[in-house]
Design a protein with these regions (language model features):
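Conserved alpha/beta enzyme-core scaffold
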Residues: 1-239
């Protein structure tokens, strides 16, 4: 099966529809599928529920989909960098399901592994546990969390071969493997595509069995979320 598509728009064609549950990889602005997010915005699909570690920032990442009102609900761990998100949420225009970061990762991992639910202590005694099953194990209370099974996963990897085997780069790996494994359909944006067999086995972080479509974007912007620099240190003794 041919997995490589000539554009992000074509990679989404026939797969993404109104009202779907989507999962998007990344951590902050690191490791996000920029071209796929732009193509999703341009497709005009509406009423999306989006699973992601965060909601992007104003004008970039998932923030673009918030500006066009294509997201009706977010399932996320952190949303503090996006003023438009704040405005929509406080105006009751956007639904939000907060999920602790580790729990979110495990819900996605469980979905990809075929595990329907699991128990965790995280969130017990807080609003996170409201309406969920609680159970005692060895004198400790745990809350049951259900797996996440997105209709479509949008993923960013560094490199792929023609068969869809993926290699991630440094911290851009983050949530992407779990997001890829959980999706019923997985679409991946990469910076380089190589021939099948040219990658060493130990370079492959995720096997191509999880990947359905690939698009190459060799020059993503990779915007820095917050630039921090160290002040120049002067040697007062030698001055």
């Amino acid at each position: 099966m041919k997995k490589l598509f000539p554009s992000a728009a074509q990679a989404l064609e026939g797969v993404v529809r109104d009202g779907q549950l989507l999962a998007v990889g990344g951590f902050g602005l690191c490791g996000i599928p920029e071209a796929l997010i732009d193509a999703l915005r341009d497709s005009g699909v509406q009423n999306l529920t989006v699973i992601s570690n965060n909601a992007g920032v104003d004008g970039f990442g998932l923030g673009k989909l918030l500006e066009t009102r294509q997201i009706k609900k977010m399932i996320a761990s952190y949303v503090g960098e996006n003023k438009e998100f704040e405005r929509q949420y406080l105006a009751d225009e956007l639904a939000l399901e907060f999920t602790p970061q580790g729990t979110l990762a495990e819900k996605l991992r469980a979905g990809g592994a075929g595990i329907p639910a699991f128990f965790t202590k995280t969130g017990v005694g807080t609003m996170v546990a409201e309406g969920k099953e609680l159970r005692d194990f060895d004198g400790e209370t745990y809350v049951m969390e259900r797996a996440l099974l997105p209709d479509v996963s949008l993923v960013k990897a560094w490199r792929a071969d023609q068969s869809g085997n993926l290699q991630f780069r440094l911290t851009a790996r983050n949530f992407n493997p779990a997001v890829a494994m959980a999706g019923k359909v997985c679409i991946v944006e990469v910076e380089e595509v190589v021939e099948t067999g040219s990658m060493e086995p130990d370079q492959i972080h995720l096997p191509g069995i999880y990947v359905h479509r690939i698009v190459c974007n060799p020059t993503p912007e990779k915007r820095i979320e917050k630039r921090t620099i160290t002040e120049k240190i002067t040697d007062k003794a030698g001055a």
